[in-house]
């Protein structure tokens, strides 16, 4: 596994723990179809949450939410429609979140959770 893949997996693990600690139930991780992948699908109360996770090892690449705009956000919405087609009876409320996981050089980890990011 490449360094970038390990960093991404680390970030998704941290994000899933963060969501669980916040009271969410993780329904799927790395859900795939032919059109792409959704990092995390969770249920938080009556809300179904589709999560994109961006992991950064520094500030060189900007913030996570800044990376999920335009085509990327539209692709995640399309993937959510596919997920919903395969999983009937979703909750009435659907939300798209971006979780940014920052792994600092000194080993500390910070999570920024932007609810309803797009």
Swiss-Prot record:
One of its GO terms (molecular function) is nucleic acid binding. It holds the Pfam family UPF0102. It comes from the Bacteria. Gene3D superfamilies: 3.40.1350.10. The lineage of its organism: Bacteria, Bacillati, Actinomycetota, Actinomycetes, Frankiales. CDD domains: PoNe_Nuclease. This is UPF0102 protein Franean1_1156. Belongs to the UPF0102 family. InterPro entries: Restrct_endonuc-II-like, tRNA_endonuc-like_dom_sf, UPF0102_YraN-like.
């Amino acid at each position: 596994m490449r360094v970038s893949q390990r960093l991404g997996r680390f970030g998704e693990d941290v994000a899933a723990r963060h969501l669980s600690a916040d009271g969410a139930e993780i329904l799927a991780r790395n859900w795939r179809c032919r059109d792409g992948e959704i990092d995390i699908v969770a249920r938080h109360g009556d809300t179904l949450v589709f999560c994109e996770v961006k992991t950064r090892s520094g500030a060189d690449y900007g913030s996570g939410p800044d990376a999920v705009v335009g085509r990327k956000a539209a692709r995640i919405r399309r993937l959510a429609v596919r997920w919903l087609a395969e999983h009937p009876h979703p909750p009435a409320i659907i939300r798209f979140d971006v979780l940014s996981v920052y792994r600092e050089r000194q080993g500390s980890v910070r999570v920024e959770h932007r609810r309803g990011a797009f």
